[in-house]
């Protein structure tokens, strides 16, 4: 979609007053490419004043668009917990210090941070998605490794949950004669916050292309995006473009192994990109 927009904008550059930068997303999935790009000056020379992005959504009907002003996407952080015990024969657990039992207790107890410590009026997620320990049925291993993710709609919420994850994991490990090493590898993504004016502009640009009834407001979701590194610096808007179509079995969302795109949406996305850029430039030169 962005390559298509590049071609159209280039073919019409003599009619455009201003500069449009087209930014792709290296290392978006966990690598915080947006942070690296920002640090290397992608928003400078010339200075970028507004920024817009589209993300496909397989569960939204083809040709629809949705977003909102304010916080759209969550701040995110990775979790890694290494539980250390003392392995031995599974038939003699009393001669071991079992990290699997301890790790299991940690997984369960972390959920109470959301249900019992987070305000019901706030949003937060702790999901342990990987648990690795041992390689034999008759051996209690010496270590268990847990990995997962934390989500919150604020950076402050992420920091608070990180502190409590560390405290809870280490305390449970001590109570069970184990040791827990807790880390948060990689980069913490900030929340993606849409500027109100940019959403209004993006909404109008999308309605020109898709139609009034195809553009709507949506609720915040707990996914994360490295686009957030840009909106920390300048006003911007991140929107979702529907690519779903049950007639071709395009009904699964991103990250699903059966994810499929109705490619008719791609040309619409290109047109939305172009119209948004033109409207933004017109608005900035008024």
Where are these regions (language model features)?
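Histidine/acidic-residue-rich, glycine-tolerant segments that coordinate divalent metal ions
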Residues: 1-3, 9-141, 224-225
């Amino acid at each position: 979609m962005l390559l298509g927009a590049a071609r159209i904008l280039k073919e019409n550059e003599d009619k455009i007053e201003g500069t449009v930068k087209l930014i792709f997303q290296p290392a978006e999935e966990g690598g915080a490419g947006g942070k690296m790009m920002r640090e290397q000056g992608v928003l400078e020379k010339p200075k970028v004043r507004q920024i817009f992005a589209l993300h496909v959504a397989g569960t939204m009907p083809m040709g629809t668009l949705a977003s909102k002003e304010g916080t759209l996407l969550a701040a995110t952080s990775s979790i890694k917990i290494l539980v250390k015990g003392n392995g031995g024969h599974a038939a003699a657990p009393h001669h071991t210090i079992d990290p699997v039992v301890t790790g299991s207790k940690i997984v369960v107890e972390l959920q109470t941070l959301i249900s019992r410590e987070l305000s019901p009026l706030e949003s937060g997620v702790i999901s342990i998605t990987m648990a690795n320990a041992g390689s034999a049925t008759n051996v209690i291993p010496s270590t268990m490794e847990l990995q997962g993710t934390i989500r919150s709609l604020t950076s402050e919420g992420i920091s608070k949950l990180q502190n409590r994850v560390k405290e809870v994991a280490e305390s449970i490990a001590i109570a069970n004669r184990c040791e827990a090493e807790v880390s948060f590898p990689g980069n913490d993504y900030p929340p993606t916050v849409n500027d109100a004016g940019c959403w209004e502009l993006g909404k109008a640009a999308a309605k020109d292309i898709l139609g009034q009834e195809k553009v709507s407001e949506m609720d915040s979701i707990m996914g994360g995006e490295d686009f957030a590194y840009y909106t920390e610096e300048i006003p911007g808007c991140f929107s979702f473009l529907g690519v779903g179509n049950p007639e071709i079995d395009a009904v699964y969302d991103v990250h699903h192994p059966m994810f499929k795109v109705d490619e008719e949406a791609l040309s619409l996305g290109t047109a939305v990109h172009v119209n948004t850029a033109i409207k933004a430039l017109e608005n900035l030169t008024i």
